[in-house]
Structures are given as structure tokens and as C-alpha cells.
UniProtKB/Swiss-Prot annotation:
Domain called Fatty acid hydroxylase: residue spans: 174-299
Gene: erg3A
Organism expressing this protein natively: Aspergillus fumigatus (strain ATCC MYA-4609 / CBS 101355 / FGSC A1100 / Af293) (Neosartorya fumigata)
Family membership noted in the UniProt record: Belongs to the sterol desaturase family.
Organism lineage: Eukaryota, Fungi, Dikarya, Ascomycota, Pezizomycotina
Subcellular location: Endoplasmic reticulum membrane
Example GO molecular function: C-5 sterol desaturase activity
Protein name (record): Delta(7)-sterol 5(6)-desaturas erg3A
Histidine box-1, short sequence motif: residues: 188-192
Superkingdom: Eukaryota
Membrane-topology descriptor: Multi-pass membrane protein
Domain notes from UniProt: The histidine box domains may contain the active site and/or be involved in metal ion binding.
Length: 352
């Protein structure tokens, strides 16, 4: 993520930090201790050297402006890096969320879903509100991983010449998917344990028939815990820098796609929107993120109903009643009483 941080610093960070924490402040009474601690005595993270510009990648060079040298917190200050990554993940996470979820809502999501008997009253505003509450906390918890990466603790590499062996730069993609799919399966399944389900994972299962805006509507610890494998991967396996940025974007888009209700992938391998709809409806199935492999091996795979893949039956009231009956039976076991407030048929007609 040093590429992203360099772009941020060049166009935003340098000016902001030079204005808020100008170099002249380093001579005041209160700042030297914090500055010195950040720049010279953090043995856990390694001592920081005076800032000298080095491009994050060989692909392009962003020559720093004068503002890069006018802050008491230079670019390589650990506190500045932490704050920058917190803001980057939070701000751009929200931007990507609204753009991708809105486009999916407009062009993909079937609006007649609001007529489903398990669609909640004011559901989409509640999904957005939950996301807005969770994003800053998830960003705060994610930032330490990114700081450790840019300070040299990860196995990120820049050019193909640096790959560990030939064709690894191609292999890294399926390896990333395989590793994170395995880890997220077990984390997600663990979140369904009765001891923690209601406090951590139930907020995401509030949405029985999710919209694209439910994609990031988690309890913050739930959303963060399922993202941990993505950030752990480059500390265990080599990963090309630009590939990491690409995968970071892909993950966010994929999360929206599996909540868009467009059941295109009737695949025995891909854990697409249909599989994930089965999970939201019936709780104890299809915990995987990308594939059905670990659900099959773990005995939790449930094949999506064939009716979901046919337009004439997907939104059929008889199919909805069948789904509702089974869902309510399972819900009593998982949650007990249902405290959700559903949209009435009259209200649903107004929303269409």
C-alpha cells in the first residue's frame, strides 16, 4: 500500500500535514517528545530516518513538492502513516461503497425485492447507517496492518524481476483467493457460534433479503475480522504491490456483487450472489467468500434453489412463501424471537 500512500501524500497529505503540523512546531515544548519518539526511538517498528524520497514503484515517479519537507511529521513518521491510512481506508472505502452499491442498485438489483415478505421497513437507509457507523472503526483496526506493510514487514515486491520464482506473479492471484477463502470460511463460520453470533454477526443478518447497500453493513468487529486474511496474506506470501491494490479493489466490488441479488453464476464452484442469498435466508449454509470448496468439505454447502435462476419464478409469491416458512423455522433455532420490523405490502407498493 506504499503506492497508495505516496499518491495520497503527493496530492493531499503533504499540504495537510504541513499546514496542521508545520516544521516550526518541532521547536515547541510539547511536540519534540512525540516527534522524537516517532522518528528515532520506536524499536518495535525500527528507527525512522530523515525523510528522503524514494519512489514506491518503478512504474512511475511522483516528485514531492516543497510541502513534503515542511511538516514536523515527515512522510516516514509512524503516527502520520497511521493517521493517513486510517483516513484513506475510511474516506475511499465510503466512496467505493457508495459508487459500487449505487450502480448495482440502479442497474442490477431487482427492485421488486422490496415486495419480499422479509424485506425490512426502511431497510436501505438502515443498511447505509450501519455501514457509516462501522467504517471508521474498521478503518482504525485496519490501519496497523498497512503501517507494518509500508515499514517493510510484509513480503511485498515491486517488479516481476523480484518475484520468488518464474510465473509467481500469475500464481499469486489464485493463491490469494485460495488462502483468503479458506480463512474467511472458518472466521465466518465461527461468527455463527451461539456465544458470539447475536453480539457480532447478527447485525449483518438483520438483512434477510439484502440490497447492495448491505454489502458493508456489519458490526465493525465482524467486518474487520473477515478482512484480516486479506491483510495477513502479504506477511506470509510474496505479493506484487500493484496486484495488492487491484485485489483490494476487487474484494470491495465482490462484496457488493454477492449482495446484488442477480443470480447469474449458477456454478458448483463459485460462491456467487445466489449462494450468499441462501446464507442470508437460511443462516447455517454457504459461509465461503469466493468458492464453495470449504462449504462442501465442511458440510455446510447448500445448492441454490433452481427457482432463483429463472425470472418468472425468482420473484414468485409461492416461492417467497416457501422461503419464508423455512427461514422462520431456522431463525427460531438461531436467534429465537424475530425482532425485525418488515415492510408491509402496502408500503412495498409505495416504494416501487
Amino acid at each position: 500500500m506504499d503506492i497508495v500512500l505516496e499518491i495520497w501524500d503527493t496530492f493531499i497529505g503533504d499540504r495537510v500535514y504541513s499546514a496542521l503540523l508545520p516544521l516550526s512546531l518541532s521547536s515547541t515544548v510539547s511536540l519534540p517528545g512525540l516527534t522524537n519518539a516517532a522518528n528515532s526511538s520506536l524499536s518495535l517498528f525500527g528507527a525512522s530516518k530523515p525523510f528522503v524520497y524514494e519512489p514506491a514503484t518503478q512504474l512511475f515517479r511522483l516528485e514531492p513538492s516543497k510541502y513534503a519537507y515542511l511538516s514536523a511529521w515527515p512522510r516516514n513518521n509512524i503516527y502520520r502513516q497511521f493517521l493517513s491510512f486510517f483516513l484513506i481506508v475510511w474516506i475511499f472505502g465510503i466512496i467505493v461503497y457508495f459508487i459500487s452499491a449505487t450502480l448495482s442498485y440502479i442497474f442490477i438489483w431487482d427492485k421488486t425485492t422490496v415486495k419480499h415478505p422479509k424485506f425490512l421497513k426502511n431497510q436501505i437507509p438502515m443498511e447505509i447507517a450501519q455501514t457509516m457507523r462501522s467504517m471508521p472503526v474498521m478503518s482504525l483496526l485496519t490501519a496497523p496492518f498497512l503501517v507494518a506493510e509500508v515499514r517493510g514487514y510484509a513480503k511485498l515486491y515491486d517488479s516481476v524481476d523480484e518475484e520468488p520464482f518464474p510465473y509467481y506473479s500469475i500464481l499469486q492471484f489464485p493463491l490469494f483467493i485460495a488462502f483468503t477463502d479458506f480463512c474467511i470460511y472458518w472466521i465466518h463460520r465461527g461468527l455463527h457460534h451461539p456465544l458470539i453470533y447475536k453480539s457480532l454477526h447478527k447485525p449483518h443478518h438483520k438483512w434477510i433479503m439484502p440490497s447492495p447497500f448491505a454489502s458493508h453493513a456489519f458490526h465493525p468487529l465482524d467486518g474487520w475480522s473477515q478482512s484480516v486474511p486479506y491483510h495477513v496474506f502479504p506477511f506470509i506470501f510474496p505479493l506484487q504491490k500493484l496486484a495488492y491494490v487491484f485485489l483490494f479493489g476487487f474484494i470491495n466490488l465482490w462484496t457488493v456483487m454477492i449482495h446484488d441479488g442477480e443470480y447469474v453464476a449458477n456454478s458448483p464452484i463459485i460462491n456467487g450472489a445466489a449462494c450468499h442469498t441462501m446464507h442470508h435466508l437460511y443462516f447455517n449454509y454457504n459461509y465461503g467468500q469466493f468458492t464453495t470448496l470449504w462449504d462442501r468439505l465442511g458440510g455446510s454447502y447448500r445448492k441454490p434453489n433452481e427457482e432463483l435462476f429463472r425470472r418468472e419464478t425468482k420473484m414468485d409469491e409461492a416461492e417467497w412463501k416457501r422461503q419464508t416458512k423455512e427461514m422462520e423455522t431456522i431463525l427460531k433455532t438461531v436467534e429465537g424471537e424475530d425482532d425485525r420490523k418488515y415492510l408491509s405490502q402496502e408500503e412495498a407498493k409505495k416504494d416501487l
